[in-house]
Design a protein with these regions (language model features):
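Alpha-carbonic anhydrase
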Residues: 1-258
Length: 258
């Protein structure tokens, strides 16, 4: 394998896809360190309001403006436009994440969904193998609240009922802005949506180190109600089998440009 950014990213783009989520054994992953750092542009510092919505199955964030954050670098060829952020969780602190790293489960998992800028929209991108890029953060429940989540948690309190929404600022995403994530290692693989229609169109990027969230903060997420006015207890898809020849790459990142 040639040691160049283009050859490596092209090889990742040609990896065989699988259904998602999956259980990942880090010791079995090929380890690469020559990728360009991931670059997150305009996520919490663009002074644009967003909408936080309880859509009956999850808490869902999107920006009101057509000016969207951009993700580039790492395993991605080209730029990917931010579409939405959402959460997966369960009733306990160990089965609320969708991906498992070395068998470890966490309280929740947050997905930042992007579509390839060469396609006109999210809907158009879903029909292509390189259509989407999803960045996943595992959320670990701890006793003390994480002040970085305060703005977002305030929104959770306002959207307890299904189809309720509230306007929030881009600062609601500022919990991403930490040294751990700027230099965080991650795994990447070609996979699918974890919700219907489960299309295999996603380049997954899952950070290895979990993000801490207070148990009380997490409790507000678990109080969100579905259409039947009953709390959403679980919105996690079970892990799927790796097909023969499927690869997951461990990336030792030098420094992300957040």
């Amino acid at each position: 394998m040639k040691n160049s950014k283009m050859s490596i990213t092209e090889q990742i783009s040609r990896l065989r896809p699988s259904q998602s989520p999956i259980a990942i054994s880090l010791s079995r992953c090929p380890k690469w360190s020559s990728l360009d750092p991931l670059q997150f542009k305009g996520y919490w510092d663009n002074e644009v309001n967003g909408i936080l919505l309880n859509n009956g199955s999850t808490a869902y964030f999107t920006f009101e403006s057509d000016v969207r954050p951009i993700l580039r670098g790492g395993p991605l060829l080209g730029e990917y436009i931010f579409e939405q952020m959402h959460f997966h969780w369960s009733v306990d602190d160990f089965s609320g994440c969708e991906h498992l790293l070395d068998g470890q489960g966490y309280a929740a998992e947050c997905h930042f969904v992007h579509y390839n800028s060469k396609y006109e929209s999210m809907e158009a991108a879903v029909g292509h193998p390189d259509g989407l890029a999803v960045v996943g953060f595992l959320l670990e429940a701890v006793d003390a609240p994480n002040p970085r989540f305060d703005r977002l948690v305030e929104g959770f309190e306002m959207i307890k009922k299904s189809e309720h929404s509230v306007r929030v600022t881009s600062e609601s995403l500022s919990w991403m802005d930490s040294d751990d994530l700027q230099e965080g290692n991650y795994v990447t693989y070609k996979g699918s949506l974890t919700t219907p229609p489960y299309t295999e169109c996603v380049t997954w990027i899952i950070y290895e180190k979990p993000v801490e969230i207070g148990t009380e903060q997490l409790g507000l997420l678990r109080q969100l109600e579905g259409p039947n006015s009953i709390p959403i207890e679980r919105n996690v898809r079970p892990t799927q089998r790796h097909p023969p020849g499927h690869s997951v790459i461990y990336v030792n990142q030098i420094k992300s440009k957040l």
